[in-house]
UniProtKB/Swiss-Prot annotation:
Family label: Belongs to the bacterial ribosomal protein bL28 family.
Pfam name, any one: Ribosomal_L28
Name assigned to this protein: Large ribosomal subunit protein bL28
Keyword Metal-binding on entry: no
A single BP term in Gene Ontology: translation
A GO CC term attached to the entry: cytosolic large ribosomal subunit
Keywords: Ribonucleoprotein, Ribosomal protein
HAMAP family, sorted: Ribosomal_bL28 (MF_00373)
Amino acid sequence: MSRRCELTGKAVQVGHLVSHSNRKTKCRFLPNLCNVTLQSDTLNRRVRLRVTAHALRSVEHRGGLDAFLVKAREIELSQTARLLKREIEKKIAEPATPAAA
């Protein structure tokens, strides 16, 4: 399992820790990944994803998983998130069935 957010694409970064004497040591900066279950209102089911804490805040800010995925770019999403986005867009595009009169 890669250390990459499924919604934002944020991954491990490599850099230096710099001491007071300016000595540099190589370091890996890991994303704050959380295993979460998010509710899709359009599909009416729950989805398990591995996302960063930043992505969770972004999902809440945009108004839920469905709104986040509709606005998200395909490049940033993981394969499972892309499939989920396509399902949501297909469900939204379906015409509402008229009520029986």
